Design a protein with these regions (language model features):
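Nucleotide-activated donor-dependent transferases that construct or modify glycoconjugates
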Residues: 1-13, 35-36
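Short amphipathic alpha-helix
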Residues: 16-26
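Active-site donor-binding segments of glycosyltransferases and PAPS-dependent sulfotransferases
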Residues: 26-98
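Glycosyltransferases and closely related glycan-assembly transferases
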Residues: 77-88, 96-109, 113, 161, ...
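Active-site proximal beta-strand in glycosyltransferases
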Residues: 88-91, 102-133, 182
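Short beta-strand scaffold positions
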Residues: 91, 163-164
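Membrane-proximal helix-turn-helix segments that form the acceptor-binding/catalytic region
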Residues: 131-162, 170
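Carbohydrate-associated surface elements
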Residues: 168, 187
Length: 188
């Protein structure tokens, strides 16, 4: 059985990155797909760099250092991974990882850390903190976030089973996507 693990990015040693490492420890032959990654961070996590596949964002100017500026193309980028050769896809998602394209004969399990906060429950706070609540730029930002919100909801139906990292996140998955989730607390 071929397994792929999908994560948004591996650029810091954070909670979701440690979850990816824990999943990779259970499935050591799995390949890891991520939008961008730092070799040093993968080394710190004990993730084999040769198993890591990055998206085209990795090669864009400041793609690794300032990857968040490419938010508008994250959905497009995650859909470019060709996962046809895998039987099982396990996404560790707090943004777009769950949106990978899969086939009907593949099993997609999403370990969800959160629905995308900046397009759902923290939308207005995100705009204010980013200085995008008012002015000309706000219209473009709101339009982009609106498009990502629609994509996020549609992409939630690509997941066969949701696992939440807490009961609270499980309730947010139910409220946002109208999908049930089983809670498995992270062992990190």
């Amino acid at each position: 059985m071929k397994i792929a693990i999908v994560q948004e990015w591996l650029v810091t040693v954070g909670g979701s990155d440690k979850v990816v490492k824990a999943i990779a420890d259970v499935f050591p032959e799995a390949d890891i797909y991520t939008l961008v990654a730092k070799k040093q961070v993968c080394g710190e996590l004990g993730i084999d760099w040769n198993k890591v596949h990055t998206s085209f964002i990795q090669k864009l100017p400041l793609g690794v250092k300032r990857y968040r500026m490419y938010l508008p193309i994250f959905p497009f980028a995650i859909e470019q991974f060709d996962l046809r050769g895998y039987d099982v896809i396990i996404s560790s998602s707090h943004a777009v990882a769950k949106g990978v394209l899969t086939k009907a004969d593949q099993l997609h399990i999403c370990y969800c850390h959160s629905p995308i906060r900046y397009v759902w429950d923290m939308y207005h706070e995100y705009l204010e903190e980013s200085g995008l609540a008012r002015g000309v730029k706000s219209y473009l930002a709101k339009y982009i976030l609106h498009r990502i919100r629609k994509w996020d909801l549609i992409s939630s139906f690509r997941v066969d089973y949701f696992i939440s990292n807490s009961d609270y996140v499980g309730r947010r998955i139910q409220e946002t996507y109208r999908r049930d989730a089983v809670t498995i607390h992270p062992n990190i």
